[in-house]
Amino acid sequence: SEFLWQEGHTAHKTENEATIEARQMLDIYAEFAENIAGVSVIKGIKSANERFAGAVTTYSIEAMMKDMKALQAGTSHELGQNFSKAFDIQYTDENNELQFPFQTSWGVSTRLIGLIIMAHGDNKGLQLPPKLAPSQVVVIPIIPSDEHKSSIMNSVNEINDSVKSKFRVKIDDRENLSPGFKFNEWELKGVPLRIE
């Protein structure tokens, strides 16, 4: 099966520029994990045995799962000039001389999706972090009889109008499904907030 990956590469004049880039990308991944995916991570440097083959330094973000195992959620590598020399990648500097650039590479994979599921899921389904949820709020009107439908739907629309500028709201007014079916369906989909 295909392993999906978001990856980037840069080349720099100086080692310091490459170091700054590699650390900045790690910070971006940590920011996403913590502030969008809602998962705390630890930023660190991999040991010589764990670093990316050919890298000078490998940085990573790691998250602790419910089973007390760590999951590597993203990496960023300082490659030095190792790959530019191996593949004869050069640039012409300001003195018109050929130089080998200092490179970086960085990436996250579908493992990050697994991290979100492992961190926020439970035995009933997925619980998406609000910033990632396609629908942040689902409103499920419970209409006991046709005579109440108009007033209940007016209330549902008032709720929607009051929150739709701040949240992504879905009104589940499907008449052919029971409230219990809808509750279960939206719980499985991981909607953070359900209003009945």
List where the protein language model places each region:
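NTP/phosphate- and nucleic-acid-binding module
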Residues: 1-196
